[in-house]
Regions:
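Short hydrophobic/aromatic beta-strand or adjacent loop that forms the aromatic wall/cage
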Residues: 1, 79, 151-155
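Nudix hydrolase/Nudix homology domain
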Residues: 2-4, 12-17, 25-30, 99, ...
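Acidic, metal-coordinating catalytic segment for phosphate/diphosphate chemistry
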Residues: 35-81
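Conserved beta-strand and immediately adjacent loop positions that scaffold enzyme active sites
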Residues: 81, 90, 176
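Active-site beta-strand termini and strand-to-loop segments that position acidic
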Residues: 84-87, 158-160
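Conserved Nudix-box catalytic region and its N-terminal flanking loop in Nudix hydrolases
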Residues: 85-123
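Unchanged
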Residues: 107-195
């Protein structure tokens, strides 16, 4: 199963055995293998009714094959970030554009994706973290210079000393960053992106 977020709307790719319970805000689509999948991202962007489109993977295709067809008409960028915990279990979060987020950024040419994750955490927060295990990939869209972009972000668990000093990268629009206790986490997650919630959920499973 794979989710792509269009702001607070969601496109889910799944097999027959993974189809979630259908509700009023969910639409299930059973496409033929020759369907024009490349139009779906633009349909998600333009529709005022679609909140959650569930796209069943045709029997003749793999998830990867469907994803390639789906994204054939958009530019895909790769990025990476970290879910950083200190020795007391507090999480590192940043505040940018009025939303709480996790440090992340675009992969540089020739750079290993795990190196991207560590570099971006250090640049955006000032925290020197230690790399842990891979957690998950998230996908989300945005518009840039009139073009629809899909960003794939690879997330890693990371570790840092207790209350490690942090400094927001203000030139990237980050207003503040710091360590969040479990007691304050729900408050922050009430004002974050759906993909960030997915990262925390993935960490609970690993």
């Amino acid at each position: 199963m794979l989710d792509i977020y269009f702001k607070h709307r969601k496109l889910t790719l799944c097999g027959k055995e993974e189809i979630p319970v259908i509700a009023d805000d969910r639409f299930l689509m059973h496409p033929a293998p020759d369907y024009n999948f490349s139009q779906i991202p633009y349909m998600m962007e333009s529709s005022i009714y679609l909140r959650h489109l569930i796209l069943e993977i045709p029997d003749e295709m793999t998830e990867e094959e469907l994803l390639q067809k789906l994204l054939s008409g958009v530019k895909v960028l790769k990025a990476a970030g970290g879910l950083v915990q200190d020795e007391e279990g507090k999480h590192l979060m940043i505040y940018r554009n009025g939303v709480w987020d996790l440090p992340k950024g675009k992969q540089e040419e020739g750079e290993d994706i795990s190196v991207t994750a560590l570099r971006e955490v250090q640049e955006e927060s000032g925290v020197e973290a230690t790399l842990g295990e891979f957690l998950t990939d998230t996908w989300h869209t945005y518009w840039l210079d009139g073009a629809l972009i899909v960003k794939k972000t690879s997330w890693y668990r990371m570790f840092a000393p207790k209350d490690a000093p942090s400094k927001p990268q203000t030139e990237e629009g980050i207003e503040k960053c710091g360590w969040v206790t479990d007691e304050d986490l729900d408050y922050r997650l009430a004002n974050t992106y759906p993909s960030v919630i997915d990262v925390f959920e993935s960490a609970k499973k690993n």
